[in-house]
C-alpha cells in the first residue's frame, strides 16, 4: 500500500508502473497469440513422464558376434575387449557401489556368442536375452544404397531389436563401451511428448540429400503407409545426447545431431514398425553412413514429427578429455586401445584401466571367498 500511494504522489513513478503493467499484458497476449498459431511451439510443450512406482525401467546394452574378414567369427579368448567392456558396464551398474543402479541391466546378446560368455554375464548380475541378428540386406531394400557396408557394419541394425522390448516402460540403451563413473539413474527423468491434434501443418516436411546428389528432396510422412494412425504413435519418448565431436569445448555446445551410443525411449510397437519402414530407404538417412545412428537421427529429427529431446551432455562422455572428466557421469569410447588410437586420451584411458582392474580384483575376491 505504501508503494501504491507513493506512486500517486510521484507522477513519474505512476507512469513507469503503468508502462511496465501494459508491457506485461502485451507480452502475455503476444505469447498466447503465438502459441495458438504455431504448431511448432505446441509440439514442443513437454510434460514430465508420470510413471507409476511399479513401472519397469532398465538399462540395456548389446553384445554382438565378432566379425572379421567378412565372416562372423566367435572370439574364444579372454582378449575379446567388447565382451570385457560389456562385463565392465554390467559390473558398474550392478555391483560397484558408487555407480550401482536400482534398475536391472539387460544384455541383448546376438545369437552365436559363446555360451560361457552368456553364463558369465548372468553370473555378473545381468539379464541375458539372446536375439537374432538383423543384417543390412534384411533391413534395406537395396544394400547398394548404403554408403559403406563391410563386416563391421553389416549387423549394426541389430541394435533396433531394443525397440521390441515392449515389456519395459522405459529403456536407456547404452553401447557396451560406455563406462559409468557416477550414478546414472537420473537419465530416466525425461519427458513425454505429444503433438497438437488440431495442427494443420502436421506432419512437417523434411528435406534430405542422397549422397552423390546435388539436389535436396522433400519427405512428408504418411502414417497410413505404415498401417498406423497418429494416436498409435503419440505420446512417445526419445532422448539422447548431442554429439560433441572429437575436439570440443567444456561443456560442448549443442549440435542438432545426437550420438546413438546412449538414448532413452519408450518401447512402442508402432515406433518399431515405423523405424523398420524408414530403414528400408537409406537415401533418406545419409545413405546409412553411420548405420542405425543415421536412421535414428532422421526418424527423430528435431524438425520432424518426432523431435528428440536433448539429455544433459554428462550422461554420454564421447571423446572425453581431462577437462571433461570432473563433470561426466559416463565416458564413452574404446579406452582399452593403446596410445595413438583414434580418440586416445591418457587420463580417460587410465580411468578405464583402473575401473577394469577394480572389477578383476572384485571377482578374484569373490572366487577366493567361495573357497572357504
From Swiss-Prot:
Disulfide bonds: none annotated. The keyword Zinc-finger does not apply. Keywords: Cytoplasm, Endoplasmic reticulum, Golgi apparatus, Meiosis, Signal. GO terms for molecular function: alpha-1,3-galactosyltransferase activity; glycosyltransferase activity. It is found in: Cytoplasm; Endoplasmic reticulum; Golgi apparatus. The lineage of its organism: Eukaryota, Fungi, Dikarya, Ascomycota, Taphrinomycotina. SUPFAM superfamilies: Nucleotide-diphospho-sugar transferases. GO terms for cellular component: cytoplasm; endoplasmic reticulum; Golgi apparatus. The gene is mug136. This is Meiotically up-regulated gene 136 protein. It comes from the Eukaryota. Has a role in meiosis. Residues 1-34 form the signal peptide. It comes from Schizosaccharomyces pombe (strain 972 / ATCC 24843) (Fission yeast). One of its GO terms (biological process) is meiotic cell cycle. Its main location: cytoplasm.
